[in-house]
A protein has these predicted regions:
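Non-catalytic accessory/assembly modules
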Residues: 3-21, 28, 39-44, 63-66, ...
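Active/ligand-binding-proximal structured segments within catalytic/core domains
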Residues: 139-151, 394-439, 483-486, 648-660, ...
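C-terminal regions of mature proteins
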Residues: 68, 224-389, 401, 512-618, ...
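Active-site-adjacent "gating/activation" loops or surface patches in catalytic cores
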Residues: 118-127, 135-137, 161, 368-413, ...
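Acidic/histidine-enriched segments that form metal/cofactor-coordinating
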Residues: 1-52, 142-145, 149-162, 170-174, ...
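A structural supersecondary motif
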Residues: 127-132, 152-191, 445-454, 639-641, ...
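A generic structural motif
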Residues: 68-72, 132-135, 188-196, 208, ...
Length: 815
């Protein structure tokens, strides 16, 4: 947990969110870090921990819900007999006291760390925050989110645009937190100057006054409520279980009133009421009451300090040294003995007789059949269509898949930029970008631009990159939905360079935040790009090369803006061509009628002019890099390809992945090493990696990776242990699929040529795993380890201590 929170405190965006809560609620539990402040965690005693846990993690302080097609009496009886009856009732006062509203707006200044040699100009976060209302107000719960979108978040929204036009920060974003007892609204200008604080506040407050005086855009209100209503009716939680997500939403009210668990789940009536109020002064009145007249506000300014992480580490070392100096020899020896006992406990496996008490499925209980594709080829050779006949509850899921294989190397990285432009919107031939955004949400459930890379299942050297334009809609809106996609893909106007710069700056800021919070993903894809064609292609659009291009374009925008516009126009001519397009559609048969005709109308307007086609071939070479950050932890990746060493992919590797994640890597990298997590992957194309997450170590972790093959070859698993790992592997394969996900899964099989026969063979191999088969898989691990591809993202000083590991080291974020 200590290293988890050191990692969390290394992300400036996380620091800002934390300080916002502290600024608004200084006298309540919301003003404290629930995960633990790493500067304070060393002060926690074991006795305090046990006392807290015994009081608050007691069933008397729990909320229990049931979900699914079940007999409540049966399950409640089981819970009572097997669990609750074992405890005495305990009176626990866990009610969250409310923060007394401020008499006047507060101003809070805090700091975050950047690299020691960072100039730290224009890297300040300016935030304006307002506490408002109660999470038990079912209308305000949704209306706050509506106002966030309409005023401060959507493309062209008035408060956001006013700040952008004034040049305050390179990204402006806002959100509302409605799931706490005292909800709040926050708007942030990222990468601003501290000197802009007063202007930042005055622009927001002046713009809010204008909004009340002149009124809110009714079409924007309708579009936002339509979007919320579509999302509510669709109830698509992706790979997350529906019952879990509904339970979490129930907590937004249930935690604060035990009689109101369902008020936010039953949102349909609330949405209808809010729609009826669009033509009234309801929303302007909310702005006046909560945004303008309300004094419970905090302006939180978080400024960069070069080398702050190092200074804090030195302060901690001095504190611990002082504590050590005050200890007697007996006290020191007691600490040494306790540490040895802890290490012994960490290495000691749980007794098998205890593990045997846990109920376990048997292999024969598990589904034998692989999940089937739902694919039907329709259309024609000139206008191919892939259809997934799946019940969707009245929603059509359309995916226009454009082959990007023939985009020249000089234009290929611009695919990522084009994707962000189509997501954040530019003006088109027939709409302003804000009007287009509203039209999309009024007539559809939204659009999404996706870059994918499909690896051929029969020839792993063949990859097909695609640009995919997706939308979803009610069946009677299919023509309008396709028309709006056409507007984006064909009629986009790239000549507004001011808007282009705004998008580039926001895209760069978003990438930076993602790279800081998901360093493990960054390190893994970078390490694999040294040898893997598919990873190298992906990295050009989603990885470090994309970020470097954004750095260059934003830094030298005036010199490069004409080149940027020309490249975007040329890229569209390579991508959006009739011969590149596959119509991919998910709906039941009654929703199919007319979709081919609608897409054919778009197809006829695609580019047909002559171009010099070439196949994009990325360069792969060993680089073994270290990327230096101001963070307090590392993300350590070691990668390679076992198929190149003559070893096959087998379904048993899915079982090994689970075993490594819950056994060897869990115990050695997390439990013993102190990292918050460690993951591994074994791809069908042979690409494999180990990567740690929020890791205090570097070389120690790499040594642990290097010993993995010997551990696997020597492990002695029993049938119960193997079955546990098989269950984990099956659960990953059999995650419930929504209709949209089932369609995308089926498309993946079609694009890669991965047959059902091969999928079934892999599942059979998975279910037939024995201890001996697991031992044999140590060869695959040894094979990819021998290739020694390494990438580490982490603390600059820590990486410099291990510089001999790297062929190159550079700062991840340049000034």
């Amino acid at each position: 947990v200590y290293n988890e929170m050191k990692g969390a405190f290394s992300s400036p965006d996380d620091v800002v969110s934390r300080e916002v809560m502290n600024g608004l609620y200084p006298d309540t539990t919301y003003g404290l870090e629930s995960g633990g402040d790493p500067e304070v965690i060393p002060e926690l005693t074991y006795e305090e921990f046990l006392k807290f846990h015994g009081k608050y993690y007691h069933p008397s302080n729990s909320l229990i819900y049931l979900y699914g097609n079940l007999d409540p009496e049966e399950y409640l009886t089981f819970l009572d007999e097997k669990y609750l009856s074992s405890y005495e009732t305990l009176e626990v006062d866990s009610a969250i006291p409310l923060q007394k509203p401020f008499d006047e707006k507060r101003c809070v200044k805090r700091e975050y760390s950047v690299m020691e040699d960072d100039i730290a100009e224009n890297e300040t976060y300016l935030t304006y925050n307002i506490a408002m209302g109660s999470s038990l107000d079912r209308e305000l719960y949704i209306a706050m989110d509506v106002l966030v979108h309409v005023l401060c978040s959507d493309p062209g929204s008035p408060v956001k645009q006013a700040l952008v036009d004034a040049g305050i920060g390179d990204e402006v974003y806002s959100y509302s937190e409605t799931g706490i007892a005292q909800p709040y609204f926050s708007i942030t200008a990222k990468n601003a100057s501290s000197a802009q604080q007063e202007q930042f506040v005055s622009i927001i407050e002046e713009e809010l006054q204008k909004i009340v005086k002149h009124g809110i855009d009714r079409k924007a209100l309708l579009a936002t409520l339509n979007e919320f209503e579509f999302r509510y009716r669709e109830a698509d939680f992706g790979s997350y279980p529906r019952g879990l997500m509904l339970g979490l939403q129930a907590l937004d009210s249930w935690l604060y009133d035990k009689e109101k668990p369902f008020i936010h789940i039953e949102a349909n009536d609330t949405l209808a009421v809010l729609k009826e109020k669009i033509e009234t002064s309801y929303y302007e009145d909310l702005v006046q009451k909560y945004f303008i007249d309300n004094r419970h506000k905090a302006v939180v300014v978080v400024e960069p300090v070069p080398g702050l992480t190092g200074k804090k580490e030195e302060e901690l070392a001095d504190r611990l040294a002082a504590i050590k100096d005050r200890m007697t020899e007996e006290e020191k020896q007691a600490v040494v003995d306790a540490t040895k006992a802890l290490h012994a406990y960490q290495q000691e496996p749980s007794p098998k007789e205890d593990l045997a008490k846990i109920p376990l499925l048997k292999r024969e209980d598990m589904k034998k059949e692989a999940a089937a594709y739902v694919n039907e080829e329709r259309g024609s050779k000139e206008a191919p269509a892939l259809y997934h006949n799946i019940f969707t509850n009245g929603i059509g899921y359309l995916n226009l898949v454009f082959d990007a294989s023939h985009v020249p190397a000089r234009l290929f990285p611009y695919i990522g930029i084009l994707k962000s432009i189509f997501t954040l919107m530019v003006d088109t031939e027939h709409y302003s970008y804000s009007d287009l955004y509203n039209e999309i949400r009024i007539h559809t459930g939204g659009t999404k631009m996706v870059f994918n890379v499909y690896t051929n299942a029969k020839d792993m050297a063949k990859v097909k990159p695609t640009f995919e334009a997706r939308t979803k809609f009610l069946f009677n809106q299919k023509d309008k939905a396709v028309e709006l996609l056409e507007e984006i893909l064909i009629h986009a106007d790239f000549t507004d360079t001011k808007r282009l710069y705004e998008i580039l700056a926001e895209y760069k800021s978003d990438m930076q935040a993602t790279m800081q919070s998901a360093g493990h993903s960054l390190a893994a894809i970078r390490a694999m790009s040294y040898f893997s064609k598919s990873a190298a292609v992906t990295e050009q659009v989603n990885g470090i090369p994309q970020y470097r291009l954004l750095e260059e374009l934003t830094k030298n925008f005036e010199d490069r803006k004409e080149e940027l516009v020309a490249n975007l126009k040329e890229l569209c001519q390579y991508l959006f061509r009739p011969e590149n397009l596959l119509l991919d559609y998910t709906a039941p048969e009654e929703g199919y009628a007319g979709i081919e005709e609608a897409v054919d109308r778009l197809r006829k307007k695609l580019y047909t002019g002559e171009i010099a086609k070439e196949t994009y071939e990325p360069v792969t070479e060993k680089k073994n890099e270290g990327f230096l950050t101001a963070g307090q932890v590392q993300y350590v990746c070691r990668a390679g390809n076992f198929i190149r060493e003559g070893l096959p992919y087998t379904g048993a590797l899915r079982v090994l992945k689970v075993m490594m994640g819950y056994d060897y890597l869990w115990n050695q990298v997390r439990v013993v090493g102190g990292a918050y997590g460690c993951m591994c992957s074994f791809g069908r194309n042979g690409d494999a990696y180990f990567v740690s997450y929020r890791d205090p170590n570097l070389e120690k972790t790499i040594r642990t990776y290097e010993q993995a093959a010997d551990y696997i070859a020597g492990c002695r698993l029993d049938e119960r242990e193997v079955t546990q790992f098989i269950i984990g592997a099956v659960s990953e394969l059999d995650t419930p699929m929504t209709p949209a996900v089932k369609g995308i899964y089926s498309l993946g099989g079609y694009m890669t040529g991965l047959s059902m026969e091969r999928l079934q063979k892999e599942r059979d191999e998975l279910l037939a795993v024995t201890p001996e088969i697991i031992q044999g898989l140590g060869r695959q691990v040894a094979a990819f380890m021998r290739q020694d591809y390494i990438c580490v993202v982490g603390n600059g000083n820590k990486l410099k201590e291990s510089k001999e590991l790297f062929m190159n080291m550079e700062q991840l974020f340049r000034s």
